[in-house]
Each structure stands twice: as structure tokens, then as C-alpha cells.
Amino acid sequence: MTDSTAGFSTRAIHAGQPFEESTGAVIPPLHLSTTYHPYSIGELRGGYDYSRGTNPTRDSLQQQLAALEGGRFGISYASGLGAEDAVLRGLLKPGDHVVMGNDVYGGTFRLISRIHGAVGIGHTPVDLTDVDAVRAAVAETGAKLLWIETPSNPMMRIADVEALVAVAHEAGAYALVDNTFASPYLQQPLALGADLVVHSTTKYLGGHSDVVGGAVITNSEEIDSAVRFIQFAAGNQSSPFDAYLTTRGAKTLAVRMDRHCDNAEAVASWLLGRSEVSHVLYPGLDDHPGHDVAARQMRRFGGMVSVRLKGGEAAARKVAESTRVFTLAESLGGVESLMNYPSEMTHASVKGTELAVPEDLLRLSVGLEDAEDLLSDLERAFEGL
């Protein structure tokens, strides 16, 4: 079922997932074949010839992803950065420019600045919460692409998607939203006017920390054609097994995200009461600078919480290495809670640059465990300071 009037969970469960005609299997089979026998030369069965180009299991995922974001086209990749690379190669050429947040994910910054910068793609980091500053940067650089990440990783800043889309379109630029932190359940950038959405499906969409993947979703046939060509020609597609795991995980996205949000709200409230804490960065808090914008463009406020400690780097490192329920690890969005020290882990590539993450900051991916156990775990770690 891909009917856009169906509810979110109905689409998550049924889009791209018809029962299998020959046996009646309710779950479509995993198609591992690399190649397909045509009816005759030039007459393909269902459009399938070689699995790098098309694969039934990958097609199921791509239809599901499009349905969840309210888009016409979904394209799945081997990783989130692979999806981002396909966008940059498909839509830009040497001499073009990207305006992005000054707290963008470190991997995105590395990809744009070092890989694509080496072939003539320029970039300008700017505070995306300052719409006038973004407008000035887009105008001064003649940017072809405005890269919006909201909530941002790991500073949890909220960008006004509708306002920034308007800035991009006034200048004739594409507006892209990285929706990884929010997930399609909490935020629908295409409905807010974005031209395309990117995801690391490794995170909330897959949801179980057992599959790496990425995606691009758009309503534009032009964008789809350009970016899908990179998937095929560069061989950066998701494998059938990875697509299968991602599809299975995404079916429960709504119920998981509600639990992530419940637990994150409890953790953020608990952190507010701790004397060791200088700042709690969570858009669900009334005093968060982006709270009103987040309330307008998001269903709820997400499962990610960042916290800064008065004891600086030493305190942050000690807490990160002292928890038992929160696991010290990179990544996010799985059912288990993760503790991350971005300055030396996920954002080590931007250390010493204008995008450096504060050394007193911890990023918490709040999972689905019992909230009482999460709070007890944090209390044990904080009592050790």
C-alpha cells in the first residue's frame, strides 16, 4: 500500500511489501540473485537484468522509504555518506558551491571539504539558525546547494526548514535536508518544501544497529534521475540483505520513535537537575533556542540529547567511560542506548577547525530500555565525578 492518505505506520508496514504471488508468502522473499533470465534478448522480466542496477528487495525498500517521507522517489545506498556523495556528484559540478551549517556532521564536512573540495566544489559553513546570515552566504557564493541538518549533530540546533527552503529557492539553489536525527516519523522536510531528503538509514530507520545504509528521497524526477544514475554507475547501492534488514526495521519506526522520545524527555529532565551539568541540549526543553521552531515542524522532539559538563573534558570522559546501560560507542538510533564523546569520536575529523565540538560535551542516543534503568545508570556515572 502506497496510498499517501494511509497513516504512517500503515505505510511503513505495507509500502513496497505486497504478498508474494506464487506462494502467497506475506513477507516478500529476499532476492539474492545477481542476475536475471529475460524472456528474450531485450525483453526483461519485471525490468530486472543485473542486480547492481535493479533488485526486487532493494526496490521494496526504496518504495517504503519514499512512502515514509511522502516522496515520489526513493533511492537506497550502501551508507549515509554514500547517499550524500551521490547527491553531490549528481547535482553539482566543479565551480559550484555548498552552503551548510557550521555544526554539520563531521563526516559530511569531510566529504564536502576534502573529497569534493579537491575537484572544485566550494563550501561555506554558516549558522543555519540565522536566516539572514544564510541568505547572505548563499548570495555571496552563488551557492547551488543549501545543506540543512536539523536537529544538528551533536549540538542539537534547530533550523527553520521552511524559511531556509525559501532562501534557497529565491537564489535558484537546491534545498537538501538531512533528516537522520529526526526520522520521517518526526519530521517531513518534503512537505516543508525541501527538494530532497537524505538519511543514514543505519540510524533510526534501520533501528537495530545491525545494518549500514543510506537513502535519498525526492519528488523531483530530475533529481531522482541524476542521483539514481550515480547509484547504478558508481555501484553504491544497498545490498539485498542490507535492504531487507532496513525494510524490516523501518516497519516499527513509529512505535520505536515514540519510546525514544519518551525516554529522551526523561533523561533531559533528569540532567537539568544535576549540579555537574552546565547545559542540556534538547529541543523539547522550553528554554531551548529552537524549541518553538521544533514544535512547529516536528511531531515530537527526538531521541537525541547532548549535555555539557562543568568539569570540562575530564568529567565528560569519565562519565562516558563509567556507564553500564549506556554503551560507549559511535552511531545512534538503535534500540540500545549509546554514549558518545564527539570531540574524539564521531567528530574527530573536524577537531581544530571552525566546526570543532566542545570537549565538555557528551551525546546520548537514548534507547528503548526502561527509563528508570537509564536514569540509575547515569546517576552512578555522575556520582563518580
Please provide the spans of the model-predicted regions.
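Short, well-ordered beta-strand elements within core beta-sheets of diverse protein domains
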Residues: 246-255, 302-310, 362-367
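Conserved small-domain helix->loop->beta segment predominantly found in fold-type I
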Residues: 265-324, 328-330, 349-356
